[in-house]
Amino acid sequence: MENIIQVRVRYKETDQAGRVYHANYFVWLDMGRTEFLRVLGFPYNEMENKGFYLAVTEASCNYIKSPNFDDIVNIKTILGKVGKASIDFTYEITSRDNNVFYATAYTKLACLDENGKPIKLPEEVLSKLVLDG
């Protein structure tokens, strides 16, 4: 299961050389993951209103080439392993036409209660991810 969003590289996301500053890739990963879950019917605000939170516990990014200011990039979010209390995602950041790979990335999210303690993913989320994924 995957979802793709497009992002235009904003000036504030670049360094003095006009290249994307490395930390901004993680902002894009968050945008892609948030939209992935929204499309599945699980917007973050609704999950939080139900008392569970998804917190990033691992994140890595392999930088291949930097897009430039005003480029449009695709952020592909791909569902990985779904555990009882965690979800893995991988990502591909490419040019609009998919001809240039800018980065690949990975995140692991843990399901937490309102006190920050690990809990099992709610059954409605787990079944949707496992059945549709």
Please annotate each region the language model reported.
Residues 1-36:
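Catalytic strand-loop segment that frames the active site of acyl-thioester-processing enzymes
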Residues 3-5, 38, 68-69, 80-133:
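HotDog/MaoC-like acyl-thioester-processing domains
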Residues 7-11, 63, 111:
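Hydrophobic residues in beta-strands and at strand termini
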Residues 9, 15, 37, 42, ...:
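Residue-level signal for pocket-adjacent positions within structured domains
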Residues 19, 52-54, 100, 119:
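Residues that recognize and position ribonucleotide moieties
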Residues 25-28, 53-55, 90, 108:
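Residue-level recognition of specific faces of alpha-helices
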Residues 36-87, 103-104:
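Hydrophobic beta-strand-centered segment that forms part of the acyl-chain substrate-binding groove
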